[in-house]
């Protein structure tokens, strides 16, 4: 028989009792008083926070958007099927957030970060980032001095974009806005291959699923999906998903920015987000303002776009940045940037309506696309006269800045004289020369879709245009000259192209570019 020591048993029981801590878990809940159109009014959540996630009885999540004296207004993230008046709603204490990480690259996700591309779950290191976050303070920012190459001749020469800038793409439907953005993503491949990637986030709002599928296929064909995250809220998704899609995309971009890397985010387009936000605001019974938009529609876009910035290079200062999420506190590095290209759709070219004027005033410049130019075969259909980049010029490399210095002015002068020439046929030789030069420059700026140009090629052909080397070439042969000219430079003077991309420019390079142009002209046009 075992020798049982009752003293030991007594001591063990006492220890277990002393180690036991009973903890009351307080769960705050409320009751749905009415629900409809994706919005629920709930009584009882007196301590709810704006932007907090709440959970319904069937597991569906919602976000608190209205805080009133007696109840809170909640938008549902998903279908309201199975939810009814009298159901319980529980606070989670969590602010709306999304899991982000490098493992998201190459995937298609929704506004909640859930993959929808049929490739299974996302595996890897993920970090929780809030959807809503304060923009970096002034002391944590640096001036925009590093270029973001788009590969589009008209933009890189006359409307340059810098890393950390916010440049609006604006125009009517079917003028090539999305194409400009996708071409910019494709052009980042060479930087990815060189080990200095610009990670891209393409946020689609209110588009058809078939359109997204074609964009994914296009990026795959150009090997651009490996450094891109596609976040989509389709036309069939709820208004809430469309409103929060840009915020989710920005959280992903901020992860790359705050860990010392460069990122580019495209919002396609914020007009549809504004419409979805108007729908939610009206359902929440907020007072409508101009064009029935709520009073805080400007704040919706300003707080979103202000988060795009160039972070200071000093790691010590960057580590103290305001409002850093705890999940990435130890990964903060300086020198990162988040560049944004918001897209706005106009109606009949009217840039003076409410949403376009709001976003123009928030951003650092705009690229305006015109239907008339598009229909006349000038593609990309950029009106360089009213397009502007307010901070990008300081980020332009030396060689491009020197060669394209008078380019925009020349084209503006050409536009003015061209319209004037329609009223009379008697023009002096100087005016005729300006018009002929302008027409050839327009031919130079034309570009096929999904075919971004190397920076060195851009500089070389723009040099030929600005120095009037094409004056003897027929207008319909300018593209033929361009092809032969760039091929010859690539075959015989590839080192010159490399020097131009490094910012080098001198009389020797000018001489080579002149001689090559003359050789091509003498061979094919004389």
Curated annotation (Swiss-Prot):
It comes from Karelsulcia muelleri (strain GWSS) (Sulcia muelleri). ATP binds at residues 171-178. Produces ATP from ADP in the presence of a proton gradient across the membrane. The alpha chain is a regulatory subunit. Its EC number is 7.1.2.2. The gene is atpA. It is a peripheral membrane protein. Transmembrane segments: none annotated. This is ATP synthase subunit alpha. One of its GO terms (cellular component) is plasma membrane.
């Amino acid at each position: 028989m075992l020798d049982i020591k009752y003293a030991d048993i007594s001591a063990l029981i006492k220890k277990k009792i002393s180690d036991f801590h009973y903890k009351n878990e307080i769960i705050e809940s409320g009751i749905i008083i009415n629900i409809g159109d994706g919005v629920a009014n709930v009584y009882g959540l007196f301590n709810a926070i704006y932007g907090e996630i709440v959970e319904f009885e069937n597991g569906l999540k919602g976000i608190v958007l209205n805080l009133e004296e007696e109840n809170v207004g909640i938008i549902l993230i998903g279908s309201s099927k199975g939810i009814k008046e009298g159901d319980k709603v529980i606070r989670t204490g969590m602010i709306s957030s999304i899991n982000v990480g490098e493992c998201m690259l190459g995937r298609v996700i929704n506004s909640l970060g859930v993959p929808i591309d049929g490739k299974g779950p996302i595996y890897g290191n993920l970090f929780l980032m809030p959807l809503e976050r304060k923009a970096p303070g002034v002391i944590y920012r640096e001036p925009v001095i590093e270029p973001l190459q788009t590969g589009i001749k008209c933009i890189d020469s006359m409307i340059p974009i810098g890393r950390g800038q916010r440049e609006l793409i604006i125009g009517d439907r079917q003028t090539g806005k999305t194409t400009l953005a996708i071409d910019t993503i494709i052009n980042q491949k060479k930087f990815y291959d060189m080990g200095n990637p610009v990670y891209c986030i393409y946020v689609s709002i209110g588009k058809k699923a078939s359109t997204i599928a074609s964009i994914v296929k296009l990026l795959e064909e150009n090997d651009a999906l490996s450094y891109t995250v596609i976040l989509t809220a389709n036309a069939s998704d709820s208004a809430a998903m469309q409103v929060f899609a840009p915020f989710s995309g920005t959280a992903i971009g901020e992860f790359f920015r705050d860990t010392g890397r460069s990122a580019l985010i495209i919002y396609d387009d914020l007009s549809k987000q504004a419409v979805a936000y108007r729908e939610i605001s009206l359902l929440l019974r907020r007072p409508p303002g101009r064009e029935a938009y709520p009073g805080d529609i400007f704040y919706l876009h300003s707080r979103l776009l202000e988060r795009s910035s160039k972070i200071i290079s000093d790691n010590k200062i960057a580590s103290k940045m305001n409002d850093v999420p705890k999940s990435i506190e130890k990964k903060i590095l300086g020198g990162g940037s988040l560049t944004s290209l918001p897209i706005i759709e106009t109606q009949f070219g009217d840039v003076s309506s409410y949403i376009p004027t709001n976003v123009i005033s928030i951003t650092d410049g705009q690229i305006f696309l015109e239907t008339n130019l598009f229909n006349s075969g000038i593609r990309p259909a950029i009106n360089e006269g009213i397009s502007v980049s307010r901070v990008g010029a300081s980020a332009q490399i030396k060689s491009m800045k020197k060669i394209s210095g008078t380019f925009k002015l020349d084209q503006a002068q050409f536009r003015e004289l061209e319209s004037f020439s329609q009223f009379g046929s008697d023009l002096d030789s100087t005016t005729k020369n300006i018009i002929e030069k302008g027409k050839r420059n327009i031919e130079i700026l034309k570009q096929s879709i999904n075919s971004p140009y190397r920076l060195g090629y851009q500089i070389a052909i723009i040099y030929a245009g600005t120095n009037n080397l094409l004056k003897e070439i027929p207008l319909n042969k300018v593209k033929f000259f361009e092809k032969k000219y760039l091929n010859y430079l690539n075959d015989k003077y590839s080192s010159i192209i490399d020097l131009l991309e490094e910012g080098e420019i001198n009389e020797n390079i000018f001489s080579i570019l002149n001689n090559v142009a003359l050789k091509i002209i003498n061979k094919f046009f004389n």
